[in-house]
């Protein structure tokens, strides 16, 4: 089973980078601006939140990984999302988490509903480093909307029919 998960994980990472049209991009005319770690009055690394989920994922939660700021985007909240289900029409593994997703603070504010607990911060270095290397953007749509787009992209890359 483990050998199958590695290609799925690689495919899934590509999914995260393939819908950049929904992201507020960083300036790419020169080197990427260096994010500045920021303290926020409400959001802190390790917090686990309930959020407005997709209808079939009521148990899904998001975890705050890091809080930073960039000149054009303002405060960025990096999150992990657990207990999602990305449907796989091939019968293969179905990803159940997004390990790193950067959002504007405004979108996280609109998405979260209840602070559940505070834990340690799960590992997210690989996803974060890929985001930095790509001068990646920041989601400006809700968490649930981003998961919908991620699932559609995942399914399209597998050759699955659209769920529209």
Regions found by a protein language model. Name each.
Residues 26-87:
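N-terminal secretory signal peptides
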Residues 1-12:
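Bacterial N-terminal signal peptides that target proteins for export
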Residues 86-164:
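Beta-strand-rich cores of mature extracytoplasmic or soluble domains
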Residues 10-20:
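Bacterial N-terminal signal peptides
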Residues 21-25:
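Sec/Tat signal peptide C-region and signal peptidase I cleavage site
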Residues 7-9, 35, 116:
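Hydrophobic alpha-helical segments and their boundary regions
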């Amino acid at each position: 089973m483990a050998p199958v998960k590695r290609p799925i994980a690689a495919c899934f990472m590509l999914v995260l980078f393939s819908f950049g049209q929904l992201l507020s991009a960083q300036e790419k005319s020169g080197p990427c601006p260096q994010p500045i770690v920021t303290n926020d009055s409400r959001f802190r690394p390790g917090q686990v939140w309930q959020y407005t989920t997709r209808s079939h994922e009521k148990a899904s939660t998001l975890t705050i990984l890091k809080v930073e700021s960039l000149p054009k985007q303002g405060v960025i909240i990096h999150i992990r999302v657990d207990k999602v289900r990305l449907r796989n029409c091939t019968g293969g593994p179905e990803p159940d988490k997004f390990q790193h997703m950067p959002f504007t603070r405004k979108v996280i504010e609109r998405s979260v509903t209840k602070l559940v607990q505070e834990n340690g911060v799960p590992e997210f270095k690989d996803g974060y480093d890929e985001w930095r290397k790509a001068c990646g953007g920041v989601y400006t749509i809700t968490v649930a909307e981003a998961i919908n787009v991620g699932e559609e992209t995942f399914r399209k890359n597998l050759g699955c029919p659209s769920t529209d």
